[in-house]
């Protein structure tokens, strides 16, 4: 198991990642424009990866869109993009038709909850069952030209075992259950901070922890 460079955000910086993702989604959906990060906080110049999830707040809270900053999990460790720009790109992709089959519409925006996961450590593993710590490690799976990922907080929120966590990530990548055991499938673990909108005007963003 090997680790990459650590990037840790303050709560204020984390809250701003969510604001930037929200602004990027709205600019894309309403005007077809790419949000410019502008004068970024110092932490946003770090070269690291980010993921964005868009969930509907209606009904059972179905996933409306999700995307990472890179087109392939193989590129997770290639820190060639600043965090601010990575968030903008991921937010736009999450809101696009390519993410969950249909582009987010303007009327949906008030009922969309935005969350951001910033990658703080990259963990390369040959034995995910042994190495995964639930609530700490996100999972990214890449194989057969497909890729998928899940936040580190999801297995704790949903009471998944390590095996279920890996299988569900395989399904996210359109791979069969158990594909994570195949030699030609790459499993990468990542540690990250997850920040999410709350819908509360007084405390609009929370940091999720296990």
Swiss-Prot record:
UniProt superkingdom: Archaea
Taxonomic placement: Archaea, Methanobacteriati, Methanobacteriota, Stenosarchaea group, Halobacteria
Pfam families, per database record: AMMECR1 (PF01871)
Species this chain originates from: Halobacterium salinarum (strain ATCC 700922 / JCM 11081 / NRC-1)
SUPFAM superfamilies in UniProt: AMMECR1-like
Domain AMMECR1: 12-206
Protein name: Protein VNG_2543C
Coiled coil stretches, renumbered: none
